[in-house]
Amino acid sequence: MTDFSPREIVSELDRFIVGQHDAKRAVAIALRNRWRRLRLEGSMRDEVLPKNILMIGPTGCGKTEISRRLAKMAGAPFLKVEATKFTEIGYVGRDVEQIVRDLVETAISMIKEDKRKLVRAKAELAAEDRILDALVGPGASPPTRDSFRKKLRAGELEDKEIEVEIAQGSGGAMPMFELPNMPGAQIGAMSLGDMFGKAFGKGGKPRRMSVKDAVEPLITEEGDKLMDQDVIVREAIVEVENNGIVFLDEIDKICVREGSRGGADVSREGVQRDLLPLIEGANVPTKHGVVKTDHILFIASGAFHVSKPSDLLPELQGRLPIRVELAPLTEDDFRRILTDTEASLLKQYEALMRTEGVELSFTPDAVNALAKIAAQVNSSVENIGARRLQTVMERVLDEISFSATDRFGEKIEIDAAYVEQHIGDLARNADLSRFIL
């Protein structure tokens, strides 16, 4: 769990996301409160519940990006899901309890990754021994093994083909099966796979591959042998229960509008009802054990173009007490997105062209022109936020991207006149913009 202060979290988010200060503050405080709660003693720790957040704002204003960046910073189990992917329990499809199951799997992967780093040195030695067994045989004399070990460490044997037996599923997740009209059917399928795996020793058939390709799978397999899987699962469940964060995107799409009560609307309302106990706190059975959701933080977000937050079930509104409105992006915001963010679009295109030996640069007036056109098209056609910049940039740089291979060593400067020439007329014609931009 990260121990960043709220100010540090906001500062980190500022590196990648322009504006939306209220939303950044809300998630920063929520994240810090997780850290504060873990430092409380006894019953008080159980009483302090997370204050779930509802982010409201038009598409492309930074809601999902805030969640993506927060996931990288949190150092905690984090899951982003679309509310539209779920159906009411009893209907065909995934039920909302799958959120908790997926969160547990995420936590297990995180903890395994951390523990693999701790045992990597031992795992590398064990993997090296298995590669040597495949190269010279287990009965080879010590001098022969030492000779080949030196060559292996020097990288001289990387292209050599060997036959090794790697357990199925080593380093990867077991395939999951969906059974229609059976809530939680994925668990049954996974458990069945586990049972057969244990019964038959989870052995894999011998595979031929180069030494270079065999190294990582063997290190992963040997590392897994050195870890206690039961301890990992227990730690993962504790981590999910205390630090888990779920980002529920597109929650406005499961709203039931006033006066509308069709078949699909009934199902949407059912998903909301199923979410209530999950957000309030429930015991969810998973293949690894029961998980309590009382202290999982839920951050919901939606554009609410057609519906409004009050169209959500009153009980669900009550379980999302902190509301944050994200402002639509202005021309000035677009300008800052193009220049101020750490991996801005301009830097990305310059780096891409550099791989072809082309030095691409943008003048300040070109940046102003790009921002102005993006804002104009958003206001006249459909406001899709920062995503409009990508469409505009692709259109402006279409010719350069296509011919870059033939222009090695050239220096190309994009100015306002170039932008106007390639996209100006298109942006001014609202009918054309509707279809092309």
From Swiss-Prot:
Q: What is this protein called?
A: ATP-dependent protease ATPase subunit HslU
Free-text function comment from the UniProt entry: ATPase subunit of a proteasome-like degradation complex; this subunit has chaperone activity. The binding of ATP and its subsequent hydrolysis by HslU are essential for unfolding of protein substrates subsequently hydrolyzed by HslV. HslU recognizes the N-terminal part of its protein substrates and unfolds these before they are guided to HslV for hydrolysis.
GO molecular function terms here? ATP binding; ATP hydrolysis activity; peptidase activity; proteasome-activating activity
Give the InterPro entries listed for this entry.
AAA+_ATPase, ATP-dep_Clp_protease_ClpX, ATPase_AAA_core, Clp_ATPase_C, HslU, P-loop_NTPase
Disulfide bond annotation, renumbered to this chain: none
Query: Has UniProt tagged this entry with the keyword Secreted?
Result: no
* Gene behind the chain: hslU
Hey, which family's this protein in? Belongs to the ClpX chaperone family. HslU subfamily.
Q: Name one GO biological process term.
A: protein unfolding
